Amino acid sequence: MPLSYQHFRRLLLLDEEAGPLEEELPRLADEDLNRRVAEDLHLQLPNVSIPWTHKVGNFTGLYSSTIPVFNPDWQTPSFPNIHLHQDIITKCEQFVGPLTVNEKRRLKLVMPARFFPNSTKYLPLDKGIKPYYPENVVNHYFQTRHYLHTLWKAGILYKRETSRSASFCGSPYTWEQDLQHGAFLDGPSRVGKEPFRQQSSRIPSRSPVGPSIQSKYQQSRLGLQSQKGPLARGQQGRSWSLWTRVHPSTRRPFGVEPSVSGHTNNFASRSASCLHQSSVREAAYSHLSTTKRQSSSGHAVELYSIPPSSTKSQSQGPVFSCWWLQFRDSEPCSDYCLSHLVNLLQDWGPCTEHGEHHIRIPRTPARVTGGVFLVDKNPHNTAESRLVVDFSQFSRGSARVSWPKFAVPNLQSLTNLLSSNLSWLSLDVSAAFYHIPLHPAAMPHLLVGSSGLSRYVARLSSDSRILDHQYGTLQNLHDSCSRQLYVSLMLLYKTFGRKLHLYSHPIILGFRKIPMGVGLSPFLLAQFTSAICSVVRRAFPHCLAFSYMDDVVLGAKSVQHLESLYTAVTNFLLSLGIHLNPNKTKRWGYSLNFMGYVIGSWGTLPQEHITQKIKQCFRKLPVNRPIDWKVCQRITGLLGFAAPFTQCGYPALMPLYACIQAKQAFTFSPTYKAFLCKQYMNLYPVARQRPGLCQVFADATPTGWGLAIGHQRMRGTFVAPLPIHTAELLAACFARSRSGAKLIGTDNSVVLSRKYTSFPWLLGCAANWILRGTSFVYVPSALNPADDPSRGRLGLCRPLLRLPFLPTTGRTSLYAVSPSVPSHLPDRVHFASPLHVTWKPP
């Protein structure tokens, strides 16, 4: 007869009417009993002939992901002008006095952040925007381009101008200016800076970039004479020595590169193609129109170039016109020809935009290193989009980067730290990742972009195969005209207007701030916010500030104090250049919602939405049907989060873990499902540990156990010899049940770790419930008062040790120690409030 749920509960000693613990508990360590129970509950995985279930409720296997939904009305979020102050360490020191070594080290890590992958794989530009939404290809293309453009305008991306120069918007950092005024990085292999060597004494100063993108400052220093002179006469040798150093093997005019598989050089060729260039720029580029076709590979550089013979009049504009503007001069091929759209506007704006600042960068190919696509900002906000950047190449393969590890507070540390009678609020840091600047040397490794609209559309329509040499013909121009494209562009014209032209051009962008798709970013963000919170805790000694990634919480003893702290802390953070979103500040009262938990003075529980998810999961969980182990991973992930709040904890999930490890299907028996369901319907809070003196000690040998409870000594023997770890665990359980003490001394490291997953399954489940809420103190065997009783010697009494226990907050970054928080509120709270005490500047 199969094991019923009631029998199973009784077996696990979860019911009140169980026999004496010293007799019942060792039975659960018996391997034979564990095997019989496992077989009865189908936990011994049979060879299954029934097809596996690949979907349980919302949980699907990792390889059958949910289909993302495209929203044509997505709003691109706006990014404030985020600029973290470079002298952040000095500012903090002015505010709070000298920083600790740990705080300084962490802040230096992100000023600027550096990224050195082992090797970088470059992908063609066509892979820049992922065809994630096959039904909305064009719409997705423009939405993504607009998002990238917004990021560039906000100073979060660099725009590759040539292989060795980039432009950006926003305020420059000194390491970016260093690159501008002389020293530059010589190729990807060299990271050190090397000053320019003067090649000709007649040239007064060196500009790192071409004439069309000089800042006004440089133009005034160089004067227009130097631009028009040597450049207009086409003396390439001298113009080279003015603009950049050249390798003798690849001597060619500035800004022109050999075209690689038909990709555009993003800068000079398109600048020349702009119909809206200033006369100065035209003069500066006049010599290029004659030399451009002699670039080192046979065909022209510009993607969509037309041979001179086919342009209607060369006087109207430069020879190499752009794909979009060519439609203006061509005959419409049908009612849905793009020329109808292009002729709607006389002035489509420039073909390309340049940033406010220009810098020298290591050699950057016209390629991307990761693809991008858009998704909903989060499950609760589908109106705004979020950019997903896939730089997974750095986490895969033989050349993968092992990201630095950092301490994340575990549940007990978090409870010890935050479970108190404080009032809480949480701050929302807007676009937290984009606060941290990246060194320009990282740019060649973190490239995103797109190959331009025509190539993107052509690549996705299966009927037209692109051959690079076809680009020159007019007939080829109309190959991309279709009703679908025309209708999409007409609708998008309402949204983007003349920007359609700008976005239809190819572009390559590199990250100037850390992107979310790289494993280094969470580490850097965690270091940064933990250092800032450490500074805040010392600046405001009555405040408990704590952070995990971009989630920052403040706690104070009363609501009034919290409000005044909130004002002071926000002003301090704003003065460092950290952008907070005041609309998203949440005031939690006395129970804080943080990292998926609700933390109050009573302890910690999972948030309501997680318990709802668990209930829903059990409702949809099929019985007696094999479930794909990848779906089990998802189920275990959810149940594992709430496991510490259940009676039996993680050990109850061990059968699931075992099947995932063996990559086999798992079948839920009615009893096992009922057992788990009951476990998760009643959740118990995890309480904070209290400091205290240890009075109860346990010890065991394979054959017997011994306890020291105050001055009392006890001993007992096992029916059969047991493995030493199992014996020690049993002794700890007996100590807890006999004394009721929440603090037990033991010399066994496995018991100390409170991880009972490696014990026989039934024993692990029962022990977890008996020892729930118990704290352990390590006592060396030689000093353990329970050592003698465990060996059967009751006559000798070792003196009790004075073993103090201090709850740990783990390796969470509390470098500046917070003042201790009283466990109860006194009748009248007195604190040095900024409201009552006159404030003196630091």
Curated annotation (Swiss-Prot):
The gene is P. Residues 212-228 have a biased composition (Polar residues). Terminal protein domain (TP) is hepadnavirus-specific. Spacer domain is highly variable and separates the TP and RT domains. Polymerase/reverse-transcriptase domain (RT) and ribonuclease H domain (RH) are similar to retrovirus reverse transcriptase/RNase H. Residues 356-599 form the Reverse transcriptase domain. Hepadnaviral virions contain probably just one P protein molecule per particle. Belongs to the hepadnaviridae P protein family. It comes from the Viruses. InterPro entries: DNA/RNA_pol_sf, DNApol_viral_C, DNApol_viral_N, HBV_DPOL, Rev_trsase/Diguanyl_cyclase, RT_dom, Viral_Replic_Matur_Polypro. This is Protein P. It holds the Pfam family DNA_pol_viral_N. Residues 197-208 have a biased composition (Low complexity). Residues 1-177 are annotated as: Terminal protein domain (TP). Mg(2+) binds at D428, D550, D551. PROSITE patterns: RT_POL. Activated by host HSP70 and HSP40 in vitro to be able to bind the epsilon loop of the pgRNA. Because deletion of the RNase H region renders the protein partly chaperone-independent, the chaperones may be needed indirectly to relieve occlusion of the RNA-binding site by this domain. Inhibited by several reverse-transcriptase inhibitors: Lamivudine, Adefovir and Entecavir. The record marks Y63 as: Priming of reverse-transcription by covalently linking the first nucleotide of the (-)DNA. One of its GO terms (biological process) is symbiont-mediated suppression of host innate immune response. Its EC number is 2.7.7.7, 2.7.7.49, 3.1.26.4. One of its GO terms (molecular function) is RNA-DNA hybrid ribonuclease activity. Residues 346-689 are annotated as: Polymerase/reverse transcriptase domain (RT). Multifunctional enzyme that converts the viral RNA genome into dsDNA in viral cytoplasmic capsids. This enzyme displays a DNA polymerase activity that can copy either DNA or RNA templates, and a ribonuclease H (RNase H) activity that cleaves the RNA strand of RNA-DNA heteroduplexes in a partially processive 3'- to 5'-endonucleasic mode. Neo-synthesized pregenomic RNA (pgRNA) are encapsidated together with the P protein, and reverse-transcribed inside the nucleocapsid.
